[in-house]
Amino acid sequence: MENRWQVMIVWQVDRMRIKTWNSLVKHHMYVSKKAKKWVYRHHYESTNPKTSSEVHIPVGDARLVITTYWGLHTGERDWHLGHGVSIEWRQERYSTQIDPDLADQLIHLHYFDCFSDSAIRKAILGHRVSPICDYQAGHRKVGSLQYLALTALISPKRTKPPLPSVRKLVEDRWNKPQKTRGHRGSHTMNGH
């Protein structure tokens, strides 16, 4: 019998991002209770030796599964040390992989307080408006003029620690161009 391959999209991330993600998830599951329906699975609960952790996030009838991996082949760069993340949408027997932006939007819609477009209607009707959006990563579009005016009038408060963002987890912080200090550049580059 032939080998059967299954291809998955795994986002290469650095180990410290995974550590930060896991600690934020646990904080919001056990301390702030904003993610109390989420399920965290340790590496020893998985049959796959490459799985370091799994977070199951119920989203309506379905669930998001964010799986972190270790011991993968290293990447092209020295800092790609074999750690990765996959993001999967599962509903009954159907599953598909999704990108980090969509995962953030789904989490945002189902779990966190949001100062959204409904605030405009409430303000016009004279109702009290809550100026909070706990999950700014879920907002990708530019708001309407009324929405922008309301956000300028009532500034949202920041939560500490921040809520876990899948987009932030898979963000490539290594390949961004480095900013040098001042107009003369760095001291080591120009020999002073």
Swiss-Prot record:
Annotated site, Cleavage in virion (by viral protease), chain positions: L150, T151
Membrane topology annotation: Peripheral membrane protein
Residues where Phosphoserine is found: S144, S165
Interaction with host APOBEC3F: annotated span: 14-17, 74-79
The organism's place on the tree of life at top rank: Viruses
Record note on modification: Processed in virion by the viral protease. Highly phosphorylated on serine and threonine residues.
Motif BC-box-like motif in this chain: 144-153
Phosphothreonine: modified positions: T96, T188
Family named by the database record: Belongs to the primate lentivirus group Vif protein family.
Name used for this protein in its record: Virion infectivity factor
Gene label: vif
